[in-house]
Amino acid sequence: MATRLTWLARAGRILERPPLWGAVATVLAVKGGTRSRQAVLRGGVCYLIAAFVANIVIKPLVDRRRPPGAGEDRITPYTSSFPSGHTASDSAFVFGVAQELPLLAIPLAAAATAAHWSLIRSDKHHVSDVLAGGAIGLGVAYIMRKSWPPRRVPRGAVAPGGGR
């Protein structure tokens, strides 16, 4: 039987949807300046790479069943439970954006944590699935930072193109 959902788990169910991260990216790209657009680009690239690594490379290699109770409220996913692809891509997006806009690290990480907690509470994933997904996301963002260092624009400076 699925566990009773708390307010955090309910919020997490909303936050675990990829369109939410697309909305965050859209607002940053439209309302922000050069740094925000750079953050969206970095976060988006990290998101796509982590999703590929978790869902296309690793999931087919690991045959892990979903936790008991998975799919009671809807159809059970047919892919392996390990690792959590949502967690991998969400974490990569958050860590990627935070490299360019460090002030967004805490609110984005809080939203992602709520989403990942709901994956556990709703019996969609084991704790280790979510931890592994987070590690993949962090690893992708780390490799991206080393291969494509963030561009630092001093506060108040106008970057090329007129944005900040």
Task: Set out the residue ranges of the language-model regions.
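N-terminal transmembrane-helix/juxtamembrane module of multi-pass inner/ER membrane proteins
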Residues: M1-A25, Q38, N55-S81
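Membrane-water interface at transmembrane helix exits
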Residues: A29, A54, I58-D63, A98, ...
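Short helix-capping/hinge motifs at transmembrane helix termini and TM-loop junctions
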Residues: G32, V62-D63, S122-D123
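Alpha-helical transmembrane segments of multi-pass membrane proteins
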Residues: Y47-K59, A112-S118, A141
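Membrane-embedded catalytic cores of phosphoryl/pyrophosphoryl-handling enzymes
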Residues: G71-R164
